[in-house]
Amino acid sequence: MPRSPTSSEDEMAQSFSDYSVGSESDSSKEETIYDTIRATAEKPGGARTEESQGNTLVIRVVIHDLQQTKCIRFNPDATVWVAKQRILCTLTQSLKDVLNYGLFQPASNGRDGKFLDEERLLREYPQPVGEGVPSLEFRYKKRVYKQASLDEKQLAKLHTKTNLKKCMDHIQHRLVEKITKMLDRGLDPNFHDPETGETPLTLAAQLDDSVEVIKALKNGGAHLDFRAKDGMTALHKAARARNQVALKTLLELGASPDYKDSYGLTPLYHTAIVGGDPYCCELLLHEHATVCCKDENGWHEIHQACRYGHVQHLEHLLFYGADMSAQNASGNTALHICALYNQDSCARVLLFRGGNKELKNYNSQTPFQVAIIAGNFELAEYIKNHKETDIVPFREAPAYSNRRRRPPNTLAAPRVLLRSNSDNNLNASAPDWAVCSTATSHRSLSPQLLQQMPSKPEGAAKTIGSYVPGPRSRSPSLNRLGGAGEDGKRPQPLWHVGSPFALGANKDSLSAFEYPGPKRKLYSAVPGRLFVAVKPYQPQVDGEIPLHRGDRVKVLSIGEGGFWEGSARGHIGWFPAECVEEVQCKPRDSQAETRADRSKKLFRHYTVGSYDSFDTSSDCIIEEKTVVLQKKDNEGFGFVLRGAKADTPIEEFTPTPAFPALQYLESVDEGGVAWQAGLRTGDFLIEVNNENVVKVGHRQVVNMIRQGGNHLVLKVVTVTRNLDPDDTARKKAPPPPKRAPTTALTLRSKSMTSELEELVDKASVRKKKDKPEEIVPASKPSRAAENMAVEPRVATIKQRPSSRCFPAGSDMNSVYERQGIAVMTPTVPGSPKAPFLGIPRGTMRRQKSIDSRIFLSGITEEERQFLAPPMLKFTRSLSMPDTSEDIPPPPQSVPPSPPPPSPTTYNCPKSPTPRVYGTIKPAFNQNSAAKVSPATRSDTVATMMREKGMYFRRELDRYSLDSEDLYSRNAGPQANFRNKRGQMPENPYSEVGKIASKAVYVPAKPARRKGMLVKQSNVEDSPEKTCSIPIPTIIVKEPSTSSSGKSSQGSSMEIDPQAPEPPSQLRPDESLTVSSPFAAAIAGAVRDREKRLEARRNSPAFLSTDLGDEDVGLGPPAPRTRPSMFPEEGDFADEDSAEQLSSPMPSATPREPENHFVGGAEASAPGEAGRPLNSTSKAQGPESSPAVPSASSGTAGPGNYVHPLTGRLLDPSSPLALALSARDRAMKESQQGPKGEAPKADLNKPLYIDTKMRPSLDAGFPTVTRQNTRGPLRRQETENKYETDLGRDRKGDDKKNMLIDIMDTSQQKSAGLLMVHTVDATKLDNALQEEDEKAEVEMKPDSSPSEVPEGVSETEGALQISAAPEPTTVPGRTIVAVGSMEEAVILPFRIPPPPLASVDLDEDFIFTEPLPPPLEFANSFDIPDDRAASVPALSDLVKQKKSDTPQSPSLNSSQPTNSADSKKPASLSNCLPASFLPPPESFDAVADSGIEEVDSRSSSDHHLETTSTISTVSSISTLSSEGGENVDTCTVYADGQAFMVDKPPVPPKPKMKPIIHKSNALYQDALVEEDVDSFVIPPPAPPPPPGSAQPGMAKVLQPRTSKLWGDVTEIKSPILSGPKANVISELNSILQQMNREKLAKPGEGLDSPMGAKSASLAPRSPEIMSTISGTRSTTVTFTVRPGTSQPITLQSRPPDYESRTSGTRRAPSPVVSPTEMNKETLPAPLSAATASPSPALSDVFSLPSQPPSGDLFGLNPAGRSRSPSPSILQQPISNKPFTTKPVHLWTKPDVADWLESLNLGEHKEAFMDNEIDGSHLPNLQKEDLIDLGVTRVGHRMNIERALKQLLDR
């Protein structure tokens, strides 16, 4: 067929739709047919005809209907069909129903006249010689009557419409006698039914039991090749109807298996498409059907078989010589198709049979890359790990029917040669196989066959003779005979699911099933496939074995007639293939399906590997307890339930010691009803109200709990792994245990092997369709794959690295190499080439919120940065149409796989992706996407995504507090627990794969961003996967606000890695090739999240209760929460995956709707209860977690730390714990600045080094990586500690600022991530000092690395952030790595690596791609002491946004620690709310705080936005974190989220600045383009690190940048206490200098994103603010009064005011409504500002219009919504004129500036061209915006939100 560039898939669909269109007008149909004929037939005909002039045959063709005669030269060796095509091509007039014209040989020499069979060769019809030119007639096929004389009139009477209809009726009812009578009377059966277009024969061929009818018709003159109106022959119809009997009958009657339909496709081709019993396929092949027929898109049969997963058809095709390397029009081989559509079994067969996995499609993508892009990480892993030694080619020769003349093109003897491509053991002498002795051939038969042979000697021997080649005799069939044969695996080819057919010679006359004789083996089965008997079978003859339902069957070989040989219950023999079904066994090795396998299937989100590690009871200490919970009406039970979602009990689930039930507590609110009753995060629910729920789905369990009202009796099992200590170690993730630090997987602290196992398990889980959400990524993958096709770069799998640690760039590269992932040039953030560099901006922000956990944990800060923009983009993508649905991101709410062992589980919701990535399986934000659109994703895809994503996510989550937060409000404790138990995947690769599969969701592996996994629409044509829009699952980050600020941050973080993808998606040319496909996935996820968020925003209950649930809904938070949570259950440290496992299934749905805060989050009052839960969760994160070090850290002090990410208790000696303790000390002693030096060393390493991405991080980051490994744990501990502290602080120090010690990640430039530390007010002062010192030191040296480590730890970098302060304990080293990480741990919430890192990054890490702060930073809050409270505050803040003031009160009231909560918001300051993030302006992403911040906003899910905001805030926070500590600073991201930054991160701006320039260039390219172009609209996109502002962004967003970043008054907490304040001031001044430098740099001014970012970073703390103030007037600071519900925005307030505000800020409620912000900030904050030492702040934030910025915070009710709402972002703090004017007075330029401020500068021109001024804005409707080119939902939402804020203001 002509190959068209159109997607094969589409073409295919088209073709089939055409097939069904029988009613097409005849004329058009004829034309189509003619075209097809010319295309299909002319080619072979012409070619053959001209083969040799000497070998041609001239025939006179008489065309009676046209009254023409032509002499045509034919090739006698071509088929009659070809000759016919030649004739058709010469016609000058068209004939009706031309396909049914045929060459008729008139009667002559005593021969009857007959039509030449179209598939026979012309020379088989000898022409009379000596009579001149032979003559043939070309005429319509009619019955050829034998009678000499015909009564034409009588015949005419017979052929009336009535009679013809009657004839069809008879056929329909199989009235053979009546049919025969009619035919005997002379009826011509070659006619079309006018209604259906069927012919009698085609109708009969589709009927059951129609053998006699078919025979009667044939005898009555029916032509076997007479085509129905749709162009298909009876044979095609029988094949499509899977009618074996009719097919066999037709073949026996002489029909050719190669008849072509109107598209030139054969029946064999159709069988590959329709699937079903492979017997039809076998029959056709046995009858010499030609293989390698291709459609107009170049798809061969094997492509179709792989596309639809018809494994047995595929294997038969391969056995009969199909070309495994055949490429379709896109250059995709069958293996590419498998990779794209996640057809695991088909891929196994191809690889097992010798398929070339190195062949690239026309996008230069290998199957491995396609799989990554499609988010099918398990499959990618399998492809990558397949070795040539695993290849077992067919050693048997195919059997053919001896009755039929062997067509020239069938595979006769040559076939062996054909097969050589898959048979590496083929002998050159293979052709003599035909002469092979029977004895030899017998060797390929099973003993049973041999025994049976005598019974049917002719059949067996006959077929054997033609079927078994000598060389092939060593076939695996020997396995059967000799045991293992050559291929040890062969004996257990578990995957054959089809039914082979007895192809024996007897088949000619007998149906396979009628064939009682010995079964003949065709070929050995592919090992590694698992089959289970689905129906019983009793042996009918010797050699067969009985099967019982449920038997596990090992298939050894495929036999003829649908019989397979295999072993069951110890018996080996034959059985019908239809009796068994394949079950996915993810494990690469062919092992029987084990309980672990099943669990993997069940919990795609969690890596079975991790689960397996604790498979044995010996690993787990099971503690069962029954608790009775009694709650009040207005509150919840205080826990968030997570688990597999299923409408009916999942019977396949086999409880294991590590994962005893499907539902488990993702988080438990400390101090809540559940907590007091002794429930802890990770507890598995065995019974609810005395009903067993071990296998019950999430929704059902939630309903059971609800039905109980206020009374609940739970029987739970606490699984404590003996590995728990290891878990802590894990947290430390000793240097990647079995990996170079490079792998950074060690963060998971799991062995690489176990990680791989997890990957596999995860894949297998994903395969299950239990968890649509989780599988989401899988859904998305197609799209991603398609995108991939378009963007070869998409294949850049760099994101795959999922290591929690951020290894040096070189390490990362090695990881990539290990993974076979193309290493994007710059894994190093500084490297402009880094594919993610461009992405960083958006991604970081997003990462901050959602991917913070995952990203930081799995991705290096740097990587994260790279990813950030794409995340951002994805965030914007979110605005895109429901791509997220297309790409169901991994359920954000995916329950943590029960075994939290692999933190990546949470981190790897991917997907999806992916997931991220067949619908788009790459939706990686499992948490976010799943939550967002759990239902959207197909179960399978979701499951796959889940599986993948979960695994990674868990990994990431473990590292990221966000994951915990994501999980639930209770996530706080859980997060701690989880963090504590966070395990860095030791196998970064596996993690990468997993995470990639949830690419969108995979913050842990930025390189692998699922976002990129957006379906590879480019790669393949899968129409269903056309959604190439990166729908960043980043939306998951939104959920970050849910369960706890932390959670939401985690979500954000998770999303962030994907964010980078979105940019690529947004801009195919983006540097991040992979990003695009992943972007789609991410975008889908993001969008999904946005929707969910919107729903949540719209639902107060969701706001509060669903914050936890929202974690689900918000996807990102959930994963974070979940991962953290699960790890929090110390017992499940390794069971993180388990946690995820169960969590993903239910959580997927639950995450959004199902992730209920049983603790009343859902039950509790929509706003307050939920928020308290959230805050509690944050505060409780540590407490809540059973092993919550938070509580312990609070109580036990530095000694007891909970890993911030995993929520596990940290080993006191672990770097994280050290960091935490150091941080504690630092917080208490403000003199730890010197630590910076050690960090300096690390400085070169990107803070969040994508372990996979960052090769250059090897030096310092290896350490960091290790530390990070522990870091997340450490961080969790810190988090826990902080939560505990926070609890304390909240109680006692409500106003304490969370000093987000964002040590200058910029110092760590490469890390590009700021250390954000939260410190109590008291600690704050000390911490500030320390931080300041540190910041200075770090900024200069590796302090940033230490920060990075924190971030790293957190998500991979967030921990490091904390680490900077942490270094107090370990002055040099700590900061650099452990110390830093430990300190970083302080960041209870993942502090997304802020742009800060970019400041220092300049040198090492050109912030060309100023990455948004690592997700951890972005989304997490550094709340060492108040961390819990602060985190909740964040979440509360988000909620507040959502519910407005009520939420804030909730925050405040929720926890005495709410003060801490406030601090948390202060930390949030770290993650400035989008609106407050001038940086967002600087980089679109900022505005688009989350990947789809805009979308989030657009969904008007402010909470989501908060998440996004968090991420943005994190970025800013990171920036300002170093600059100062705004204890109560509430940072609002451009996305409109306000976060209290208890202690603004010390702004390591200086670093950022230089980096910014570099970054800018890079960013400008990738990020700016992507962000601006694609994500500009969603201002809420997480801002990349300040320094990471992209130049392009700067241009596009410059106004915005100045407004959002530079102009925005810095959000600082004036309440910098003493030394801290001083330190902050110092940092501030440094930052200012840096900023000035940056600003000084052309295009880097306030307008320039980096400039803005710098400012943004600097403004972190009031003092820093003042310092920065001089440097940057563009930063926005806002204080949140504890009492106020909205963060206070400090626009361009005077430094005094700023200071006052800072001071006030401390007190202000975490979130102040924009209005309140304006009021309070202006009045009270003014006084507060005085307290703040940075009067210059206003200068820094010389955004006079900052007050609107307050609104910008979106803190007003609308703005406060959970998701980073665009509304907040929309009023970016800007110095543009529009900020001082009422909207209706805005001019067109004002509108353009305003759009810029929203990071939507890409739409400026359209608005200008359409002369849209302020008076038009309020009236713009959705349709108007679409007409204006604002097609992204997120962008529209951002605009609408911003407008609403403007109008409400």
From Swiss-Prot:
Pfam family, one: Ank_2
Tissue: Isoform 3 is present in epithelial colonic cells (at protein level).
Subcellular location: Apical cell membrane; Cytoplasm; Synapse; Postsynaptic density
Disulphide-bridged cysteine pairs: none
PTM sites of type Phosphoserine: S831, S960, S1099, S1709, S1713
Residue span of region Disordered: 1-33, 451-493, 764-808, 878-910, 1013-1293, 1328-1371, 1432-1526, 1574-1594, 1678-1776
Bias type Polar residues, positions: 1445-1460, 1678-1692
GO CC terms of this entry: apical plasma membrane; brush border membrane; ciliary membrane; cytosol; dendritic spine; growth cone; neuron projection; neuronal cell body
SMART domains: ANK, PDZ, SAM, SH3
Segments forming domain SH3: 526-585
A biological process term (GO) from this entry: positive regulation of cell population proliferation
Residue stretches making up the PDZ domain: 626-720
Clinical disorder: Autism 17: A complex multifactorial, pervasive developmental disorder characterized by impairments in reciprocal social interaction and communication, restricted and stereotyped patterns of interests and activities, and the presence of developmental abnormalities by 3 years of age. Most individuals with autism also manifest moderate intellectual disability.
Quaternary structure and interacting proteins, as annotated: Is part of a complex with DLG4/PSD-95 and DLGAP1/GKAP. Interacts with CTTN/cortactin SH3 domain, DLGAP1/GKAP and alpha-latrotoxin receptor 1. Interacts with DNM2, DBNL, GRID2, BAIAP2, SLC9A3, PLCB3 and CFTR. Interacts (via proline-rich region) with PDE4D. Interacts with ABI1 (via SH3 domain).
Protein name, per record: SH3 and multiple ankyrin repeat domains protein 2
Organism: Homo sapiens (Human)
UniProt gene name: SHANK2
